[in-house]
Every structure is written in structure tokens, then in C-alpha cells.
Amino acid sequence: MKKLLMNQKLVITVFSVLIVGLALFALVPMVVALVMGPGVRTEPVNAENAEPATTEANGEWTVAQGRPPNTSSVGFTFDEVLPGERTRTSGSTQDVSGAVTVEEGALTAGEIVVDLTNIVTDRDVRDENVRNKLLETHDYPEATFEITEPADLSEVPDDGTLGEVELTGELTIKGNTEEVVQPFQVLRDGELIIVSGDVVIDRNEYGVESPEMIAADIADEGEINIRVALSKGGQE
């Protein structure tokens, strides 16, 4: 009789473990859905409704809000990797500041500062992971891009169509600085200059590590998505 009772307890225990295991397995897609998704991407410059330039290029330009769809925004795009599945996700912020100098048709100096503490995706849980675990914004609240070599702007059209300019600068994330040499699209739209580009980076070079306690691994290579509106008044 005692042996029979022990066997019954064993069966009940195993059955209970199976139920719990199945329940946890069923929850995995729900957890993944909470932290994964396309995110909020900083899209490239849109020249569809751009107007001819109304302001001389030479002078001091400051980061402005811009006009939809070309508002100032900086963000990231990375792949998230799960067993048998790879999805792309993005985050962005419109908390961008800075200034550049144009002299004799050349961009001679400039720095763009991005407030990372307000970066958002499309999931609150992932927002917290990005800010606190990936970017550690409590210690590194800002990222910067500083121009280190002059760039010729003389070939940028002033008729509201896109031009391309190669910019050389230093990108700093989490206190780690790497040189960037990157072609950017440049648009003169009325009183604004819009600068846009996707900078490919290896997150490991900037000390951005994938935490263990998140639902998906993060690909090493991704993009920093940049779209910055500049004006001489800084108000538009």
C-alpha cells in the first residue's frame, strides 16, 4: 500500500511538472511578442515636396525640429535573432541638438548630440532594455557625431533635389569613439538643410553588449539612422 501511494505521488509530481512546463512553453511566444516588433525607425530624407533653397549655404546652422516628413531624428536598426527566426527592429529619438559651420561652400565644423535617455521603439519593455541594459543611459546619456574633416557642399543642388556628400567624423557611443567615413544625402529645402544617412556599425566596437536576460540575441552589425534638419535660426 505504501509503495502504491509513493507511486501515485510520483505520477502526480511528474504530471504537475509537465503542466508547468507546457504552460511556460506556451508563454514564450507571448513574451517574445512583448519585446519584439518592427520598432520606430528614422527613415531617410524625403525630397518629394522639397522647395528650392531660399537661404545662402554659408554661415552657422543649428539643429532644428524640421518639417514632416523630414523632422530631426536619430536612431538605430538591428536584427534580433531567435532560433530559426531573424527580425529587424528599430528605435529612435527626436531629442537631437547641435550646430555646424559652412564656409566658402564647405562644411568645416560641426557636432550633433543625441539624447539617448528618450529613445523609443514600439514596446515599453524593450525601451527599458535598450536604455538601461544596452546603452546604459544612466552612465552614458548622450551619443555624439563630430565632423573632423571639411566636406565640399558646392555640388549640393539648390533646386530642392537630393545631393550626396561624404562626411568624415567621429561617432561616440557609451564613451567609445570610432572614425566614420560615410556618404550622406543632403537636401536644401527652402530655409532648411536636411542631412540623412545610415551608418553601419559593429556594436561591439562601442561597448554595446547583448544582455543575457532578454528574449533575443542582437546581431553584431547594425545601423545608426540619421536625419537632421538644420536652419540658421534653429526654430523651424
Residue ranges and their predicted role:
Residues K2-E236:
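Low-complexity, acidic/polar, glycine-enriched regions of mature
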